[in-house]
Curated annotation (Swiss-Prot):
Alphabetized UniProt keyword annotations: Cell inner membrane, Cell membrane, Membrane, Protein transport, Translocation, Transmembrane, Transmembrane helix, Transport
Native species: Xanthomonas euvesicatoria pv. vesicatoria (strain 85-10) (Xanthomonas campestris pv. vesicatoria)
Protein name, per record: Sec-independent protein translocase protein TatB
Family, per entry: Belongs to the TatB family.
GO molecular function per UniProt: protein transmembrane transporter activity
GO biological process, alphabetically ordered: protein transport by the Tat complex
Source organism phylogeny: Bacteria, Pseudomonadati, Pseudomonadota, Gammaproteobacteria, Lysobacterales
The keyword Endoplasmic reticulum belongs to this UniProt entry's keyword annotation: no
Record field: transmembrane: 1-21
Gene: tatB
Localization terms from the record: Cell inner membrane
Role this protein plays: Part of the twin-arginine translocation (Tat) system that transports large folded proteins containing a characteristic twin-arginine motif in their signal peptide across membranes. Together with TatC, TatB is part of a receptor directly interacting with Tat signal peptides. TatB may form an oligomeric binding site that transiently accommodates folded Tat precursor proteins before their translocation.
InterPro entries, alphabetized: TatA/B/E, TatB
Subunit structure: The Tat system comprises two distinct complexes: a TatABC complex, containing multiple copies of TatA, TatB and TatC subunits, and a separate TatA complex, containing only TatA subunits. Substrates initially bind to the TatABC complex, which probably triggers association of the separate TatA complex to form the active translocon.
Membrane topology: Single-pass membrane protein
Length: 208
């Protein structure tokens, strides 16, 4: 701590021995040791305080540097925000100007002009409605005229079916060999009935 070498310590011990003598030298040595220890302790405490202060100053400096960097970043953010707001304002002004120019270029119809336009458009609508009604009537009239003449259905006369007769057992063989009855077709009222050759045979069969 005091940068004292071995030669210097021996010189101090010889001087103390000559001045104090052999009886007082041990007490003086103890007293000197206590003062040296106290001096070292104080020196260590001062050194620690200085180191703490230096560390605190370094921390302060680092904090100041960090604060300065944060301020710079905040200033940059403010500048960018101002630029963005200015750009948005200019864009809004340009859009509003374009809208105003277009609104001034397109004429605005007054209520009187709108009413006049409605009155002028109503006769055209009535005329078109009349034309469509006439066209619809023209299309429906031929359909009705074509549907009216309907030809009457031909009158058909119903001929009664021949009555079944009960034939006795001896004549069963004769009926088995007889021809089957022929179905008579419907005959119109205006045409005379045609003679069929099977009529005499049927009359003979009906006789007992």
């Amino acid at each position: 701590m005091f940068d004292i070498g071995v030669g210097e310590l021996t010189l101090i011990a010889v001087v103390a021995l000559v001045v104090l003598g052999p009886e007082r030298l041990p007490k003086a040595a103890r007293f000197a040791g206590l003062w040296v220890r106290r001096a070292r302790m104080q020196w260590d405490s001062v050194k620690q305080e200085l180191e703490r202060e230096l560390e605190a100053e370094e921390l302060k400096r680092s904090l100041q540097d960090v604060q300065a960097s944060l301020r710079e970043a905040e200033d940059q953010l403010r500048n960018t925000q101002q630029q963005v707001e200015q750009g948005a304002r200019t864009l809004h002004d340009d859009v509003s100007r374009d809208i105003d120019i277009r609104a001034s270029a397109t004429p605005v119809a007054t209520p009187l002009e709108l009413a006049h336009a409605d009155l002028s458009a109503s006769p055209d609508v009535d005329a078109t409605a009349g034309v469509t009604d006439a066209a619809g009537a023209a299309h429906t009239a031929p359909v009705i005229a074509q549907a009216q003449p309907i030809a009457p259905a031909p009158h058909q006369t119903l001929v009664p079916a021949p009555h079944d007769t009960i034939v006795p057992a001896p004549h069963a063989a004769h009926l088995a060999s007889a021809p089957e009855p022929v179905a008579v077709a419907p005959v119109d009222a205006g045409t005379p009935a045609a003679w069929t050759p099977s009529a005499p045979a049927k009359l003979q069969e009906k006789q007992p």
